[in-house]
Amino acid sequence: ARRKLLDKLTVEEMPASSRRYPFVGFTMERECGKEILAVEGLSKTVDGRKVLDNVSFRVNKGDKIAFVGEDELAKTTLFKIIMGELEPDEGTYKWGTTITTSYFPLDNSAFFNDCDLNLVDWLAQFTPKIPEANTESFKRAFLGRMLFSGDDVFKPVKVLSGGEKVRCMLSRMMLYGSNVLVLDQPTNHLDLESITAVNNGLVDFKGVVLFSSHDHEFVQTIANRIMVLEDGKLTDRLGTYEDYIASMANAAE
């Protein structure tokens, strides 16, 4: 499966970058089974405020779920808990046995601050452990399609701009071949071309996506299920973002 993933990433086949649109494409090494994720009664208090209050939901095969609502901390806290970075005060979550995850955190500073690696060596940390992926030409070609070309690839990662760091984090996710992607505001710091590329990559992805974003069009084009987090409570809207906006408008009337 690793080999099949890498066949798609061979240097010859990599789309020639126009220096405007990065190429973002996620492939799965294995299909999701029936059990994806079950969340039961999650509660969490942060700095004296209950940001999650008895939150329960199940994720199904084919779901692309946008978590929406004004409370950014609630969404980030939920993602951190299901990714094992934070303990809940109460409740449980369980990933299915076939599931492999890749996580795009809201704050990526831990990956770059105090890191003395250049881009090629940084990417090498996440490259599959098979010979063809560990060649300089593979890594340079991979970075090239994410708009890092020439001597750019030897820049220390700690001096990269916000948008460049986001492209690095997306590159890392693409190399993992996971069947579930969890993304906390992946469009922050990106220009329109990069947002379009991420959008297309997530629309085409055959696995499961859990994400948050302030970009309404991004949510509308990707999500087939909306979950609203308000005052610590979760409401599952089993429709598109357009349906959700329409129902909000009706409620306001």
Regions found by a protein language model. Give the residues of each.
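ABC ATP-binding cassette signature C-motif
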Residues: 21-253
